[in-house]
């Protein structure tokens, strides 16, 4: 996946940036524990009307799925229609990695060696590391999920095998959520016809939203693993789509971008926990600029969803 936020460095700066990205986990202080705010019963009919209005104005196809985890309320548009994921499918890879760890078939400390032959373009820093650099499974999972590192993603797929991602998604009742190949390596596809149609991966708004719902409920792998994965996704660096107008909102999220595709799925920790997945395809505006139409569409939908649930809650008082 190539996009405007791709972190590009050369020489020794790659290793420096890599260390900084991984180290941020040790220094970031998340929002926590203050007294729980009263939940909001959103007017979902009004929210649906607002989201449909935004989607209707978009020059492309928009699907969405929104779930209020506190009340169980759900709304969707084209919820069961398949869309290209771009890098959003990396969430399914992350879940499979942690599932294999939980089963004792993989360790987060297992080494992964970066070889020149493994390095692919697009997002990330691992493509710039020197031949023979050793990461751990945890390092690669972190890089894949926070800066959408394509080389780190491929190292993980080599270790876990693509079909295991399919099997894990099937076990969760997500039969249309599929990764097809390694990133930027179409010839590694295990489903070439689907690769040609959808690219790197495919899902539906309802299925990807349900995957985030399962993580929020501790049912994707187990409560400890799901909590760890959501913590990683809270460190995602993308802030120009669903999160654009929501400064201060706590969110675990992942996005994807190709020329004609913009996607993002998020778990917001508002007064309610709210999952939202917005997928777009066949976008007329294919510019790689901040104000790309699809990115603005997602930004406006994100604002509408959060406002329907009472807006961004106040930050907890500092201790």
List PLM regions with ranges:
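Bacterial Sec-dependent signal peptides at the C-terminal "C-region" and cleavage site
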Residues: 18-41
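Acidic helix-start/capping segments at beta-turn-to-alpha-helix junctions
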Residues: 69-70, 108-125, 160-161, 183-187, ...
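Structured C-terminal helix/loop/strand segments within mature extracytoplasmic catalytic/sensor domains
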Residues: 33-54, 159-161, 210-240, 246-250, ...
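Second-shell loop/turn segments in exported
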Residues: 36-41, 77-84, 124-131, 139-143, ...
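A short, well-structured edge-of-sheet supersecondary motif
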Residues: 46-79, 278
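Mid-domain, small-residue-enriched loop/turn segments at the edges of structured enzyme/sensor domains
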Residues: 61, 133-136, 141, 154-212
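Active-site-proximal loop and beta-strand segments within enzyme catalytic domains
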Residues: 99-142
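Active-site SXXK
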Residues: 72, 84-112, 276
């Amino acid at each position: 996946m190539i996009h405007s936020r791709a972190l590009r460095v050369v020489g020794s700066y790659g290793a420096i940036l890599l260390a900084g990205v991984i180290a941020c986990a040790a220094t970031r202080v998340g929002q926590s524990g203050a007294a729980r705010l009263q939940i909001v019963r959103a007017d979902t009919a009004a929210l649906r009307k607002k989201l449909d209005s935004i989607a209707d104005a978009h020059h492309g196809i928009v699907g969405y799925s929104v779930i209020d985890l506190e009340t169980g309320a759900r709304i969707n548009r084209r919820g069961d229609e398949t869309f290209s994921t771009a890098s959003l499918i990396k969430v399914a890879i992350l879940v499979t990695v942690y599932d294999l760890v939980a089963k004792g078939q993989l360790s987060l400390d297992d080494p992964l060696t970066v070889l020149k032959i493994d390095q692919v373009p697009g997002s990330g820093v691992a493509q710039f590391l020197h031949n023979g650099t050793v990461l751990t499974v945890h390092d690669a999972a972190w890089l894949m999920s926070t800066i959408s590192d394509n080389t780190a993603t491929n190292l993980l797929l080599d270790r876990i095998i693509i079909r295991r991602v399919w099997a894990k998604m099937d076990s969760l009742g997500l039969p249309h959520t599929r990764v097809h190949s390694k990133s930027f390596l179409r010839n590694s596809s295990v489903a070439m016809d689907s690769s040609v149609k959808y690219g790197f991966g495919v899902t539906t708004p309802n299925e990807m939203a349900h995957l985030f719902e399962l993580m929020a409920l501790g049912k994707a792998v187990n409560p400890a693993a799901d909590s760890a994965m959501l913590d990683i996704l809270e460190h995602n660096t993308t802030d120009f789509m669903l999160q654009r107008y929501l400064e201060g909102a706590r969110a675990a999220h992942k996005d994807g971008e190709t020329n004609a595709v913009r996607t993002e799925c998020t778990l917001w920790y508002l007064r309610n926990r709210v999952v939202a997945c917005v997928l777009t395809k066949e976008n007329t505006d294919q510019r790689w600029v901040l104000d790309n139409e699809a990115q603005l569409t997602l930004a406006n939908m994100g604002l509408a969803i959060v406002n329907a649930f009472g807006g961004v809650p106040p930050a907890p008082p500092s201790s």
